[in-house]
Structure formats: structure tokens, C-alpha cells
Amino acid sequence: MHAPAGAGLAVQVAEFAWRVKNLVRPRGWARLGLPCQLMGAGMAFGWRDLALIDLANGHLVEDVKLGLDLCQQGKPPVFCPEAVVSSLFPASQQGLGSQRTRWEHGHLSLMLADAPRRALAAVTQRNGSLLAMTLDLLVPPLALLVLSLLGLNLVAWLAYLLFGLAAPAWIALCALALLGLAVALAWARFCRELIPFSVLLYAPFYAARKVPLYLRFLIKRQVEWVRSKRDEG
């Protein structure tokens, strides 16, 4: 997905995160000979494979669930970089908001409710592909990952100041530094022509703006699939 012309910094950061999730990470898994998550478009299936699973689930991220179901049946999705489907992020704030809520509440719901069961199935079936897809599912959305590591650093360094516990503080700082390095490398290799590096400096503020979205997940999460408001014309 691409940011429409004249889009603000938040949408540009979202475009970067989208490319990392749907191009960079799947290419990495493919280089390791492992499957990828399904992405909602540009997918091809065999009728016999679809007959193995229940399609009538109505999940917010039904594409991701479909990929996990197929993998558990011994049909792991294979990444095909030549299959490209392009679209634009909604230009309206209402459309953007509903789209983000559906994606992120759906991802988090599936991660919390489904990941333990998938991990157990991967171990009992000795299904390495399913284990890899489950580990990939456990990676939270980029904004939430940034917020989590910032919060972890705050707590860890506070513990260091109060109790002298240095190891947790340095581990938390190293994790945050590794995330920053990974983001910088992803931008340099795959997104340099997409956005200037200066836009990435807005990422912490972009993450902070999504705090209400994550609070709503805890208080009143979205469970029904709602189509995003599209732009007219």
C-alpha cells in the first residue's frame, strides 16, 4: 500500500511499516526457506487445499488466520515477490482510523488467542513451518513494538536507579538499539526511495498517537469486520 499524494508524516510512516511487514520480512523468511503470512491480496490457492479448512470464520484478519490454517494442514504459504497488488491508504481520517483498528485489533486478538494453540500444534506435529509462522505472528505491530521497548527501558532504568539492577537495563537498551538498527537497515535497503530518513524521526510520535487505539483494545476491542471508508471517485 502507498501513501496518497500529499499525505502527512503519519501515513508515510505507515507506508514504511507496511513495506517492512509485507516485503522485507517475507523476503527474509523466504531466504531461510520458510513460509510467510498471507497478506489479503495477490494470493493463489488450489481448490483441494481450500477444502481442508473452514473459510467461514469472519475474523478481523481472516487472511492471516487462513495462512496459519493452511500451514497447520501441511500447506504453508510461499512468498512470491513477483505477485504485486498496489493500493492507496485512505485519505480520510475516518477511513485510516477504521483500517488501523481492524488490522491491529485483529492482529493482537489472533496473537493472544491463537498463538499458544499454534505453537503447541507445531511442536506436536513437528511442523517447523507452522512454528516459524507462529513466531512471526508474535511480532507485534511496529508502533506497539516501539512503545513496548520504550516502556521496558523506562521501567528497567528506573529499577537500576532505585535498586542498582544493571543487567535488565542494559538488556532493554540493547533491544531498543537493535530495533533501531533493524529499522535503519530496512530503510537503507528497501525504502530509501520511498521516504526520506528524516520521516523516520517522526516514528516515536507516530507510535505515541496510537496509544488510544491500544487502550481501546484492552477496554473495548473491535470484534466485527467493518469495511474502511474509501475515498470517492
Q: Each predicted region: which residue ranges?
A:
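Active-site donor/metal-binding and catalytic loop motifs
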Residues: 3, 81-96
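Short, hydrophobic alpha-helical packing/hinge segments within bilobed ligand-binding/sensory domains
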Residues: 66-67, 96
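Catalytic donor-sugar/metal-binding loop of nucleotide-sugar-dependent glycosyltransferases
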Residues: 33, 58, 67-86
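Membrane-proximal soluble regions of multi-pass membrane proteins
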Residues: 99-118, 196-232
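Active-site-adjacent helix/loop segment of glycosyltransferases
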Residues: 97-156
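Membrane-embedded multi-pass helical conduit in multi-pass membrane proteins
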Residues: 136-220
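Long helical/loop segments within the catalytic core of UDP-sugar-dependent glycosyltransferases
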Residues: 1-58, 101, 108, 112
